[in-house]
Amino acid sequence: VIKNITDAPIRVQKREKEEVYEEAKKLLTKMGLADKADAYPYQLSGGQQQRVSIARALAMKPKMLFFDEPTSALDPELTGEILKVIKDLAAEHMTMVIVTHEMNFARNVADKIIFMDKGVIAVEGTPEEVFTSEHGRMQEFLGKLSVE
């Protein structure tokens, strides 16, 4: 796991190995995985693997993160782990673009939501504007979900 996180910053960004390893350890602690530094990815749960991938991305010090359905392949019981990590990143003002069907999560974390229908932006705005939109397709979509 630690090598998985440190490889790109060392090889691509040519950063100092010691600095990168220290940062990776901090990222693993932040992800709740400090005890997994020497584990192999196959020894981790899906949620743990996803958190390692987020740590790997953060190790590159990006200005923005992109997530495409970050919880879709996870056991429902592990979804909360990933949503908490993303929520914590939002609280730290990390800019993120997240494609998700986790509508309650989007409502609570996003400062802007874009709802797309058939590849076209149908509704965009603040969570309040989007979730109270009178747009027919938006209402139909929300009606099929249990959004509080």
Report residues per predicted region.
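Conserved ABC ATPase signature
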Residues: 40-44, 48
